[in-house]
Amino acid sequence: MSEILKNDVDPIETQDWLQSLDSLIREEGVERAQYIVEQVIGQARTSGVSLPTGVTTDYVNTIPVAEQPAYPGDHAIERRIRSAVRWNAIAMVLRSQKKDLDLGGHISTFQSAATMYEVCYNHFFKAATEKNGGDLIFFQGHAAPGMYARAFLEGRLTEEQMDNFRQEAFTDGLSSYPHPKLMPEFWQFSTVSMGLGPVNAIYQARFLKYLDNRGLKDTKDQKVYAFLGDGEMDEIESKGALTFAAREHLDNLIFTISCNLQRLDGPVNGNGKIVQELEGLFTGAGWEVIKVLWGSDWDKLFAKDTSGKLTQLMMEVVDGDYLTFKSKDGAYIREHFFGRYPETAALVADMTDDEIWALRRGAHDSEKLYAAYAKAQNATKPVVILAHQVKGYKIPEAESKNTAHQSKKMSYESLKGFRDFFELPLTDEQVEKLEYIKFAEGTPEYEYLHGHRKALNGYVPARRTKFDVEYKVPALEEFKALLEEQPRGISTTMAFTRALNILLKDKNIGKTIVPMIADEARTFGMEGLFRQVGIYNPHGQNYIPSDRDLVAYYREAKDGQVLQEGINELGATASWLAAANSYSVNNQPMIPFFIYYSMFGFQRVGDMMWAAGDQLARGFMVGGTSGRTTLNGEGLQHEDGHSHIQAGIIPNCITYDPSFAFEVAVIMQDGINRMYGEKQEDVFYYMTTLNEVMDQPAMPAGAEEGIRKGLYKFETVEGKKGKGHVQLLGSGAIMRHVREAAQILANDYGVTSDVFSAPSFNELAREGHDAARWNLLHPTETQRVPYVAQVLADLPTVASTDYVKGYADQIRAFVPSKHYHVLGTDGFGRSDSRANLREHFEVDARYVVVAALSQLAKEGTVSNQVVADAIAKFGLNVDRINPLYA
């Protein structure tokens, strides 16, 4: 750009244009001015004028003073309530610290956000009613002490509970952060670790729209609020779904980002401006951005700033300096902020240093915040409020310091100073004892506190533990077609699809089934659902799909049932979690079935799945194309041999690796019954399915209980008497090789084999350890026998799966025989035929036979030479590298 264009060559003409715009705004309003400016910009582009993108605005409040609505609250009473909440939050954390239990705790985050939350508690947060689920609030995890402090003032928590903050093992304590598992009637959503709150809030807002558009629940009056930290926005999960929210027109979604400019160790962007960065990000993603940066004290300064230097200065100052200013004093701010320009220095010439120090950031001003939230209520797109605040507000040891996040203590003098600033009704002795503040019934504060919550339907947060609407669980007989022998081979994935179709057609619960796919429907043979129930899209289908002439064409509809999530496992899991919590959040039980490549589930979104356990989710995760050797051509990053290990660490995740179609049916019916039947258990299911076609026999009589528990005898293959007897366990893809091995053992070696299907080694291990624990603690009582020991005999045993050896090895302690050998697929996957891969990982029928003979040799039934001869006969390379290291 030339030097001429960098400077204003005709200031008078420029001033004329600006005055014309001011006149237009004054006479015809902001909307008309916006329209005219857009037309001018359009004409400029048409005429070849190069324009900046313009995704950020000046570092000032978005809402002009003239457009601020009147504040509906009583400032004096609200300040007294807010101050009491502030104190109780600090007192709770400090009282727990006195016990010397190394409990930790955070006092700075809530102090910076207290005004923000209190404005919402008094004027916006709606609780649930019988007809309406209320607003859904994702509270910032580190601000949890403030929510406890308010609930204590409301009489919903006791002093004993407050004193047991972060002490939950043996007392009625309060969890460190929002954890529904630990406080099931209080917290609705898990928001830690950081980043989970934003993405889950987006998909929760989307699921409300889904319910409404499908006519299942009227959610139009509900909002989803998410309170986040500016440091938290560095998490990929925080940013990854922003464009999705705009695409879905989630006008029911409100983010509030606490822009205290600090993360855990220091500034978020000390050399820049995180507010501007976030504004550009959200504006570009299609959100409405409302900046609340400066309190009402600044309004008179802006009004006096005819030169525009104050706004210029605010744009020039970087975040590192803003943090330093609030860690110093008024004199420092006068010199190092206002003193940068004569014009800005003149603005505060008649102000004392104390008055300068008292100038507030926007997030500490109720009127500015109320204006922002009021504007957000009527938005036509998702909204983000960027609220400028001071971390550790009014805590001398923490205020705006890099150590603020780690501040867990306050001196007696600091506590007295805090009391004095907030005018708390506490004596010096009460301050020293950290006594809690409560309002007596009948006081103005008590009546105001409860009156405003009653006007908003009740108290938040609060969580429903069970749904109370009628829900009829289908009987196993409804899956009869899958319990019988199949006329031709099918994969267990196809069996799942058929079972899903049975559920979709169920007249009682069909509408509550939520099929979810991460852009792989055709891989799983599920494209028929596109036409059958449609793909959900809030905008319908405004184009003619290229495959419209096909039976299974890509049909999108506003009331579509399938949630097609695209290539987006994290978002799809967040979507699943929203549906899996609908029973609690909406009193509307929904059964989500999310099917995906099993390698891209728990491994990719493990933190989200742990949160699903915490949130007491109910639903099905289906790991398709599972097993290390089954998705044979895709190679190392696609072949799953360990998802059951990862799923098994989540206590309320029930996992299965079925071998047969009838097992799939039993597992699905059992899961629905446990989660949505009379008991309403807080569990969710993980089931792996195969893309390998196999023969599908009929279910053996009486096998249901064994399938559910994880082990049952499938068949016995008779050999010759006296030649040996083994037990062969298998699951999933390797079950066919186990059955083949049983035939070889009988035909070639005369060995009898009891073949067991083991749909869940995880469930077997849990039950076994539970029995072992009981036995340990009850030495004088009749000892319990683990289920594995009840089912298996004291015979040489071999377990074979398409997963790492650790999966089947979990039950070793409960197997009656000391001769127990496990085959598995430890090591990196690779591409080849299934036969070659199973040879590579040493899990095919030949290795099962050799392992069985080896165990027989150990008990003396056959000689070691028999084993050696079998190895030679099968051509096994005994000198090749262990596949674990290959």
Curated annotation (Swiss-Prot):
Ion transport as UniProt keyword: no
Q: Name one GO molecular function term.
A: pyruvate dehydrogenase (acetyl-transferring) activity
Entry-linked SUPFAM superfamilies = Thiamin diphosphate-binding fold (THDP-binding), TK C-terminal domain-like
Instruction: Answer whether the UniProt record assigns the keyword Oxidoreductase to this protein.
Output: yes
What this protein catalyses is: N(6)-[(R)-lipoyl]-L-lysyl-[protein] + pyruvate + H(+) = N(6)-[(R)-S(8)-acetyldihydrolipoyl]-L-lysyl-[protein] + CO2
Function in brief? Component of the pyruvate dehydrogenase (PDH) complex, that catalyzes the overall conversion of pyruvate to acetyl-CoA and CO(2).
- Protein name, please? Pyruvate dehydrogenase E1 component
Q: From what organism does this protein derive? A: Haemophilus influenzae (strain ATCC 51907 / DSM 11121 / KW20 / Rd)
